[in-house]
């Protein structure tokens, strides 16, 4: 009788331990799943790729291959990679660099935007750009919200008030071979500080994302009318190498201000 009681007690304790083990495994799995975007949430993120002469082989690599994408092609060279997640390939005239492409996408898709739009240049094969773009996607996935990887300044307009450029050459080798021009078409209003004042009325912002790599929440885009973006793109429609593109690079936070749905993370 005593042996039977001991046996029953052992079975009971073993059952409790087994239950606790299975509960912990189940809890860990669910916590892990909640920390990352599920497939449905990944479909709410779209990559907008501004391509000129790059091969875009990276588009099939992890983590880029997790997300739907649209490619805007600005050259006659159509020899580049797409992926099963590519929803469209759009040909555009070669004006305005990537900045024009980004505004064009917003204008054309104003009523059909993804919850999070991630803007990438085609040159993510370059190590510095690849590292930043991969981190951006990882931060979006981990934080489950839009993220802006950036450098922080006390006041962007004041920091870059006198900034202007007379020459600039594409940093990607394939792009510079196809288009070796380095003379910039000067902005009608310059330097940056005056241009910024004209566009954004001296709005104070503190964050800048370089390399044309950043993302925006749909709500932040739609809080401004389509005409807001239609007016801004005019500065980028007449030249393949506009100085204004470098001004926009420093002013994207003003374009979408306030970015209240976004987590700012300094690089």
What are these regions (language model features)?
Residues 5-267:
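ER/Golgi luminal nucleotide-sugar-dependent glycosyltransferases, focusing on the catalytic module
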Residues 1-3:
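Juxtamembrane low-complexity tails/linkers enriched in Ser/Thr-Pro and polybasic
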């Amino acid at each position: 009788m005593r042996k039977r009681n001991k046996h029953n007690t052992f079975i009971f304790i073993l059952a409790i331990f087994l239950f606790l083990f299975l509960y912990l495994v189940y809890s860990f799995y669910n916590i892990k799943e909640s920390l990352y975007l599920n497939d449905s949430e990944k479909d709410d993120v779209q990559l907008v790729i501004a391509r000129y002469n790059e091969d875009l082989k990276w588009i099939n690599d992890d983590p880029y291959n997790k997300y739907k994408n649209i490619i805007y092609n600005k050259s006659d060279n159509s020899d580049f990679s797409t992926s099963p997640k590519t929803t469209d390939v759009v040909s555009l005239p070669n004006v305005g660099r990537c900045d024009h492409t980004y505004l064009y996408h917003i204008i054309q898709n104003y009523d059909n935007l993804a919850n999070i739009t991630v803007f990438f240049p085609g040159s993510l094969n370059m190590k510095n750009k690849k590292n930043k773009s991969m981190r951006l996607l990882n931060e979006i996935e981990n934080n489950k919200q839009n993220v802006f990887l950036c450098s922080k300044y006390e006041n962007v307009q004041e920091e870059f008030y006198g900034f202007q450029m007379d020459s600039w050459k594409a940093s990607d080798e394939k792009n510079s071979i196809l288009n070796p021009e380095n003379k910039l078409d000067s902005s009608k209003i310059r330097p940056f500080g005056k241009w910024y004042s004209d566009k954004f009325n001296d709005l104070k912002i503190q964050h800048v994302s370089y390399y044309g790599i950043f993302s925006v929440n749909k709500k932040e885009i739609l809080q401004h009318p389509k005409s807001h973006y239609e007016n801004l793109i005019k500065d980028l429609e007449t030249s393949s190498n506009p100085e204004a593109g470098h001004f926009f690079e420093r002013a994207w936070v003003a374009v979408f201000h306030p970015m209240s749905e976004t987590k700012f993370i300094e690089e």
